[in-house]
Regions:
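Extreme N-terminal, non-catalytic leader segments
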Residues: 1-6, 34
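Hydrophobic anchor at the beta1->P-loop junction of P-loop NTPases
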Residues: 9
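Walker A (P-loop) phosphate-binding loop of P-loop NTPases
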Residues: 14
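Conserved lysine of the Walker
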Residues: 17
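Hydrophobic positions on the alpha1 helix immediately C-terminal to the Walker A/P-loop
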Residues: 20
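ATP-dependent small-molecule kinase phosphotransfer cores
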Residues: 27, 31-123
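Short glycine-/polar-rich loops that comprise or flank the Walker A/P-loop
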Residues: 33, 124-128, 172-173
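A glycine- and Lys/Arg-enriched "phosphate-lid" helix/loop adjacent to the NTP-binding pocket
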Residues: 97-164
Length: 173
């Protein structure tokens, strides 16, 4: 049996993470390699709560902790799949929480360090993390062409900060 692996695709909204993830999945499975695709927030109870928007009105730190709780459950599932020899392809993981939540917390380095510390307790280390980088203006235009509603995470100045956070994280890890 082939040994499994955990590969993460990170990047701002509209960067193409989901597309790249799907293409890698298709390439692997066409060669008979067992692979699964997952994403964060997940579809667990905590992930569904985050996705529903019902968490609106809570503090930014509490929201960040919800993402950590979702990731804790997700990591257990990922570890099981990898131990079964599967390649797990994940659309967003740890870096997304740090990039987005630290932007919401005004990019303060103390908040960024706190986000890293609370996440490191619960995350599995990916075998590879691929940052799909894009100019936020291009990403925003892609999001707009999907016909989706622009969320609080998709304003241009916010996406500029998110991209900066991702690039800083890429230098650190």
């Amino acid at each position: 049996m082939m040994s499994g692996a955990f590969i993460v695709f990170e990047g701002a909204d509209g960067a193409g993470k989901s597309t790249v993830c799907k293409r890698v999945f298709d390439a692997l499975t066409s060669k008979g390699i067992e692979a699964v695709v997952t994403a964060e927030p997940t579809h667990t109870k905590v992930g569904a709560f985050i996705r529903s928007g019902a968490a609106g009105g809570i503090s930014q730190r509490t929201e960040a902790l919800l993402f950590v709780a979702d990731r804790n459950d997700h990591t257990e599932w990922i570890d099981e799949e990898v131990s079964r020899g599967k390649i797990v392809l994940c659309d967003r993981y740890f870096a997304s929480t740090v990039a987005y939540q630290s932007a919401r917390l005004d990019g303060d380095s103390t908040d960024r360090d706190w986000l890293i510390r609370i996440n490191e307790q619960f995350i599995g280390k990916p075998d590879a993390t691929i940052l799909v980088d894009i100019d936020p203006r291009v990403g925003m235009s892609r999001v707009g062409t999907r016909g989706e509603e622009i969320s609080k995470f998709e304003k241009l100045d916010f996406q500029d900060q998110v991209r900066s956070n991702y690039l800083d994280l890429a230098k650190s890890y």
